[in-house]
Amino acid sequence: MPNIKSAKKRVRVTRKKTLRNKHVKTMVKTAIKKFELALQNEDVETAREELKNATKTIDKAVSKGVIHKNNAARKKSRLTAKFNNIAS
């Protein structure tokens, strides 16, 4: 446990930011899982909609600084490639 006042504040701030970041990351993972479930069911229209939602969620995470833009680009690229395999 920190003794210095600024260190105590850093612990509080870090705890708050960790919770916020965890929430956003969970939303991204959930969106990706929904998309992959639609792919498994081979429902192209639902998969297209879930891909759109997943991409939107990933972009929001980037804008909030939770994930790096290159990480987001890689995730979106892989999801799009999976969709294109099933759609064609």
Curated annotation (Swiss-Prot):
Q: Which UniProt keywords apply?
A: Ribonucleoprotein, Ribosomal protein, RNA-binding, rRNA-binding
Q: Name one GO biological process term.
A: translation
Q: Name one GO cellular component term.
A: small ribosomal subunit
Q: Does the keyword Phosphoprotein apply?
A: no
For this protein, the record's InterPro entries field holds: Ribosomal_bS20, Ribosomal_bS20_sf
Query: What is this protein for, i.e. what is its function?
Result: Binds directly to 16S ribosomal RNA.
Q: Which Gene Ontology MF annotations are present? A: small ribosomal subunit rRNA binding; structural constituent of ribosome
What name does this protein carry? Small ribosomal subunit protein bS20
Q: Does the keyword tRNA processing apply?
A: no
- By its UniProt entry, which Gene3D superfamilies does this protein fall under? Ribosomal protein S20
Family recorded in the similarity comment: Belongs to the bacterial ribosomal protein bS20 family.
Origin organism is Natranaerobius thermophilus (strain ATCC BAA-1301 / DSM 18059 / JW/NM-WN-LF)
